[in-house]
Amino acid sequence: IWIYDEKYKEYIKKAKEHGLKLAFRVFFDGGVPQYVYDAGAGRSGSQPYYDDPIFQQKFFKFLDAFAKEYNNPDLVDYVDAYGLGTWGEGHGVTLKNNTDATYKAVIENITGAYAERFSRVLTVMNLSWNDWKFTEESVYKKGILPRRDGIGSYWFNDTERKYLHQLFSEDKLAFIGEGCYWFNDSSNGSKPGYTYDFKNDKRFQMNTMEEALTVSVNDALENHSNTLDLRVPTQCKFWIERLPGEVQKFITNGGYRLYPARIKVDRQGNNMLIQHSWRNYGKGMLPNNHPSWNHKYQLTFSLL
């Protein structure tokens, strides 16, 4: 159980000690407690049947407790509001009643449960061509933000890039980006045996780890990402020691950077008229329209 897991508690403790905000994904592939199955929930291999009412009942009870602990924007940046399938990325979702109607209902039930309980924290969902026919209307039109792993690789394909740009330009949704996981390769690409090594990528030409991570930065910026993680400890160390300029490049240009472009003040008797326009110097977007934020950041002027 999560509240008793020592590794979990240590991660949270260390993050708080270093002043780091938290982000969560709860995934079920191999992660569902045995008591859920003992209660009668069905399964297929390492995954539950996500449309099983017993599974959903147990999960929603967990989610009540989890949200009570973490529905706090001072502690948590965002929460993944889905987590189904392999790696929690929506691949191979297992259903008892394998129909489109059931699939759509499961997506709506899970994301809706997160949205209801995490009312103060940004909610996101992994963007995938596989379930887009459901998620466009049932998830993203409701304000949940797109999140995509595989930035800087061919896994992030042209179809998904098109969807993402639509969500950014038309629906004004900020993008949560995650760099491609190069299998914790600290050998700078010289170690054999990596099936999906960056040298074999079908979209980008990359021969060294420096090139692979630089591609990730550029790809994240081109796709208007608000975030780009430094991944696991080995890659994080590599970033800081070998590519500090690329780290700073994303810090400077990623996300949103709002500055006043023009301010004009006209005094009319006892009244003052302030005309102003602002420019975003970042490639991303302030997610102020997310339902959990509900435009909570408002512009004000102070007269001193």
Task: Give a label for each model feature.
Residues 5-18, 63-71, 265-268:
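Short amphipathic alpha-helices and their capping/turn segments at secondary-structure boundaries
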Residues 29, 46-52, 62-100:
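Active-site groove signature of glycoside hydrolases
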Residues 289-304:
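Extended low-complexity, serine/threonine- and proline-enriched intrinsically disordered segments
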